[in-house]
Amino acid sequence: MPGKLSQRIGQRFSDARPNAATYDVHGVVTKVYADDHLLALAVQDFLRPFRGQPDAEPDIEFYLLTKDSGSAGAPSDYFAGAELLYDWQVLRYSREGQLRYQEVPGAGSIVADLDQGIAVAFVDSEIAACTWSVTHVVFFPIWAQLLKTRGIFPVHAAGLERGGKGILFPGKSGCGKSTLSLHLLHNGFRLLGDDTVFVRQAGRGAEMLFFPEEVDVCPETIDLFPTLALARNLADDRWQPKQRVNLNAVKSSKVVEASPADLLVFPVIAADGVTRYERVNQTEALAELILYAFLFMDPQTSKQNFALLAGLVQSVACFRLHMGLDGVALAGTVDEIIAAT
């Protein structure tokens, strides 16, 4: 980390080391340090399935340090001249050489050295108890970019497997990925993730890797699957309006760690309520898939990311699934897609 940063927070690094945990995420080891037990617990819950050996050599080191709201603890003054890559209002993402800078107004900021695999987050103490915000808005975007520089690429998608066939369902928030995943789980499919799936190169195609976080569901989905109410996380969070369900408490035997990506299916909610599917050509599929790649335009990894997604599209059949209201019919249609390839 640059000297101007390390000099300022060197003591904070020492304070954070007692709260340390190691996570082995599909062969990439991340060590997380926190100076607040709530921050440490948030990441622990988020990455619990990947808990690794404490003495493992880390590929990524991530420091979570609290600061008072409005204080000068954040490193934003160091990066006034950084080039803005993204501005999603909730999150701004910039670069300066190999450094990446992320600002989340009202929550904190992060600086990361992609080459060294080090990130330092300055988190407003007021949101330390907001576990979803800490993990998904503060921690995940920069951590995902660090993973990408090490060959693991997150995609905004659901991933499921049946009979050895892996299906990637890319889509934006609200397109029905979680509800689709639950319907398929109840009809014999196995889950890699309902909202985020990791993908890495595997020959000419790609391999899907599980990321079994809590499933984000709306009240209508709870109504469809009443047993989910027993596994809800009732904690309130400013950036997450949906309810969250721990699938391990409902269908723990239905999770699979890895699967070849054999099919690419883009889910949309059918306006007429009738489930059906159609073929999608490769050009259209690639143009749409890129939209669901996290931080795709980061110059550090865009070429490798594009090559991975293009190889995936060229190696599998691509479809669009119009999802109706009947869960059994939905699962049957996905089986038809599998049989058609």
What is each PLM-predicted segment?
Residues 1-173, 186-187, 197-341:
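A noncatalytic interaction/capping subdomain that flanks phosphate/NTP-handling catalytic cores
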Residues 177:
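Conserved lysine of the Walker
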Residues 180-181:
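Post-Walker A alpha-helix
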Residues 190:
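Residue-level detector of anion-binding/catalytic polar loops
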Residues 194:
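Active-site flanking residues adjacent to catalytic metal/cofactor-binding acidic residues
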